[in-house]
Amino acid sequence: LMDLWQRENVDTTTVLRDTQAPTGMYFVSHDAQGHHFSYARAGSAASRMQPQDLTHWADSIAHSQWLHLSGISLAISASACDTAFAAMAQARSSDTRVALDSNLRLSLWPLARAQACIRHAVSLCDLFLPSLEDMTALTGLTQAQDIISWSHAQGAAQVVLKLGAEGALASDGHKQHQIPGHMVQAVDATGAGDCFAGNLLARLSADDDLWAATAYANAAAALSVQGYGAVAPLPTREAVLEMLHTPSKGTPA
């Protein structure tokens, strides 16, 4: 991972390494119903995070535009969840914006705990990135508009609801934009949500508005499902811009 990050020009100077614990892993299998995850995360280095570790990251959090977390950040252990909540509070006090991806994985924790923790996390975030499937499981809501309303009611100022093949619905609490899906030949959706979140935050950090950033992220995620794996299919900026200006072909993704 360190080698990959460095090759991609990601700053690794504040990465903490735990020599007593393995890196968490997951395995992806595919069948007619899609992709399925198997986890080897118990006792992983990330799961051993403690709130006191934040002293190591305090300056990074304070000087960043965004702190990004997901439901998995909360699910891998109680101490990781506590650390995530403390980091979110620290970011808010430093005027660093907080983004949260619902990323619900019920194989990692019970539904009742997921509901309570994710609800609290939404109250601490500026931008919430749920999926329709996750929110139906968490809240029982099935309609996009109801999920947007619920998310704002919990405290999220901005919400981008991922709708899979139908694209995304972005809301700032005053207006909404529906971003349609792109027509591509989809083979593997592994990592598409992370691709979406990363590109969305990159474009917001570059001062795109919510609508333009969502359109860009939507195109990037569509491109990413055309290959297998979570890293190799990630598109270049040039490929995303080309998709944004090219009529769609194939099937929605």
Kindly give the residue locations of the regions a language model identified.
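Short glycine/serine/threonine/alanine-rich loop segments
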Residues: V10, T96, A230
